[in-house]
């Protein structure tokens, strides 16, 4: 795929990082397919304002969709993309104690759906956001990529660690180029 014609699928496109990354990609001439469920965990009005800005680019397509839905991959059947940047997640440590099912659905099932979609579409690369919460009770500072991350202290951290392990296995089994960050 020629670099200038690359299309990025960005999940969590209306969030802070998703919006700014998509805005940068679009301003550099790339195409972006954005997905966001527009949950009310963060201000929905702000998310809609961000989407208005992204919609000013002709190369931006938006799908209001929950990546944890079984039909999510079918929603994207009309669009092509080369790279997946997976930023969507249910965030928040405290909230994960109160509502663990939402984290299971959004973070684990949603990531599984993205992994399956990436393999079935033969994407060039999958990039997935993790969190510093995966370091858990690790007291070694600063955190390093080679440190153990097997002591999550919240369900949120556990779901993000599970995402890392799932992505690693898909990379190994299916040859899916994957980067966790």
Model-flagged regions — what are they?
Residues 1-181:
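N-terminal Rossmann-like NAD(P)+-binding domain of SDR-like oxidoreductases, especially those catalyzing
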């Amino acid at each position: 795929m020629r670099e200038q014609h690359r299309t990025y699928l960005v999940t969590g496109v209306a969030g802070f990082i998703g919006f700014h990354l998509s805005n940068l990609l679009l301003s550099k001439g790339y195409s972006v397919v954005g997905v966001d469920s527009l949950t009310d965990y963060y201000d929905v009005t702000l998310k809609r304002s961000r989407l208005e800005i992204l919609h000013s680019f002709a190369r931006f397509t938006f799908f209001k969709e929950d990546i944890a839905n079984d039909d999510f991959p079918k929603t994207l059947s009309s669009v092509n993309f080369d790279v997946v940047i997976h930023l969507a997640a249910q965030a928040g440590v405290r909230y994960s104690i109160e509502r663990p099912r939402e984290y299971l659905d959004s973070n684990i099932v949603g990531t599984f759906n993205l992994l399956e979609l990436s393999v079935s579409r033969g994407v060039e690369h999958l990039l997935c956001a993790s969190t510093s919460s995966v370091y858990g009770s690790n007291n070694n500072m600063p955190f390093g990529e080679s440190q153990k991350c097997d002591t999550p202290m919240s369900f949120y951290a556990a779901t993000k660690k599970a995402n890392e392990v799932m992505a690693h296995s898909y990379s190994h089994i299916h040859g899916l180029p994957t980067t966790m960050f």
